[in-house]
């Protein structure tokens, strides 16, 4: 039972009934809820998700067009060419991308996201991505999203014209903590790309990684900054420390804090798709993942991630079936 007068009581009126997200101060109260109130938080977040987003879960597969060799120094990422990590630079050709899209579609996924480890695309990458999107759309009934770094207006317009329906560019963390995570570019550069994406009519996808050493105040700050984007989708990653990176020795996020964060992000963004992404297997395990799917999450990446292993996609599909969570069906508008 929710205790009257608590932040959950406030959220029930403000978020569930009115669809208005919590502010930063209110989110701090959510992030510091006692452990015994986490089930109440999950229940409320699930009710908010059902009312404002519906009951369906969107499933997505991702693939890396270009892996490794990135010139940026994102401290969590093994794809940086500046760190002594085991990841090496690899390019995929278009036939392999089309085949991967076909395999993704067979799982029931409605979206296939093509990712490249770059600060921003050069002409070679832009051309290959445009050709890949056209090739995939000609053979596979699936939406194509992309994540290839910082873009200028011309590049944004080209991707929109090619048929990219959603663009991912994560803010990664709160503006105040960003300099502790990345030093080779700014938070503002990322924000500007997202502004251009929205202006071009593509759906905005932006999230980040929790558990990188940010304070609870910065976690609440991050949720509000994401909400200000009015994003279609927010991927929620949890730090999976990668060998050779500056964050290699960071501890995993506590599972209870992860659940509080999921609930808080749902209460900050009642209308937004919250997508389970990297690190959930280590941070939450099977039980925690099930709690989160009944506590505000309404989308998942299935299969492996960019440089880390996920769960077998069959296990995730079985989990959704066991929880009686319907998978979103792709609706084509003609």
Curated annotation (Swiss-Prot):
Its cofactor is [4Fe-4S] cluster; [2Fe-2S] cluster. It is an enzyme of class 2 (transferase). Binds 1 [4Fe-4S] cluster. The cluster is coordinated with 3 cysteines and an exchangeable S-adenosyl-L-methionine. It catalyses: (4R,5S)-dethiobiotin + (sulfur carrier)-SH + 2 reduced [2Fe-2S]-[ferredoxin] + 2 S-adenosyl-L-methionine = (sulfur carrier)-H + biotin + 2 5'-deoxyadenosine + 2 L-methionine + 2 oxidized [2Fe-2S]-[ferredoxin]. The keyword S-adenosyl-L-methionine applies. Pfam families: BATS (PF06968), Radical_SAM (PF04055). Keywords: 2Fe-2S, 4Fe-4S, Biotin biosynthesis, Iron, Iron-sulfur, Metal-binding, S-adenosyl-L-methionine, Transferase. Signal peptide: none annotated. Pathway: Cofactor biosynthesis; biotin biosynthesis; biotin from 7,8-diaminononanoate: step 2/2. One of its GO terms (biological process) is biotin biosynthetic process. Its EC number is 2.8.1.6. [4Fe-4S] cluster binds at residues 70, 74, 77. [2Fe-2S] cluster binds at residues 113, 205, 275. PROSITE patterns: RADICAL_SAM. GO terms for molecular function: 2 iron, 2 sulfur cluster binding; 4 iron, 4 sulfur cluster binding; biotin synthase activity; iron ion binding. Residues 55-280 form the Radical SAM core domain. Belongs to the radical SAM superfamily. Biotin synthase family. Homodimer. Catalyzes the conversion of dethiobiotin (DTB) to biotin by the insertion of a sulfur atom into dethiobiotin via a radical-based mechanism. This is Biotin synthase. The gene is bioB.
């Amino acid at each position: 039972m929710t205790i009257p007068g608590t932040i959950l009581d406030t959220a029930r009126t403000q978020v569930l009934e009115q669809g208005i997200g919590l502010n930063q101060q209110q989110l701090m109260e959510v992030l510091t809820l006692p452990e015994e109130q986490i089930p109440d938080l999950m229940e409320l977040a699930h009710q908010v998700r059902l009312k404002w987003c519906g009951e369906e879960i969107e499933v997505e597969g991702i693939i890396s067009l270009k892996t490794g060799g990135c010139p940026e120094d994102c401290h969590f990422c093994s794809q940086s060419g500046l760190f002594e990590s085991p990841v090496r630079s690899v390019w995929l050709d278009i036939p392999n991308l089309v085949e991967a899209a076909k395999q993704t579609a067979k799982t029931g996924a409605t979206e296939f996201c093509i990712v490249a480890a770059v600060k921003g695309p050069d002409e070679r990458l832009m051309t290959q991505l445009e050709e890949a999107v056209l090739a995939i759309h000609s053979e596979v009934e699936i939406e194509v999203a992309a994540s290839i770094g910082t873009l200028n207006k011309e590049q944004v317009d080209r991707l929109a014209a090619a048929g990219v329906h959603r663009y991912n560019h994560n803010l990664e963390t709160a503006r105040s903590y960003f300099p502790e995570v990345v030093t080779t570019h700014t938070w503002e550069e990322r924000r500007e790309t997202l502004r251009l994406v929205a202006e071009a009519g593509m759906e905005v996808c932006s999230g980040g990684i929790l558990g990188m050493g940010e304070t609870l105040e910065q976690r609440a700050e991050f949720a509000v900054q994401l909400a200000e984007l009015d994003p279609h989708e927010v991927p929620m990653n949890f730090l999976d420390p990668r060998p050779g990176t500056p964050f290699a020795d960071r501890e995993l996020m506590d599972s209870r804090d992860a659940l509080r964060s999921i609930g808080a992000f749902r209460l900050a963004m009642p209308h937004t798709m919250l997508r389970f992404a990297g690190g959930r297997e280590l941070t939450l395990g099977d039980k925690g993942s099930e709690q989160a799917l009944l506590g505000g999450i309404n989308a998942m990446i299935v299969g492996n991630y960019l440089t880390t292993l996920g769960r077998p996609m069959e296990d995730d599909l079985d989990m959704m079936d066991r929880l009686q969570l319907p998978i979103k069906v792709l609706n084509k508008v003609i």
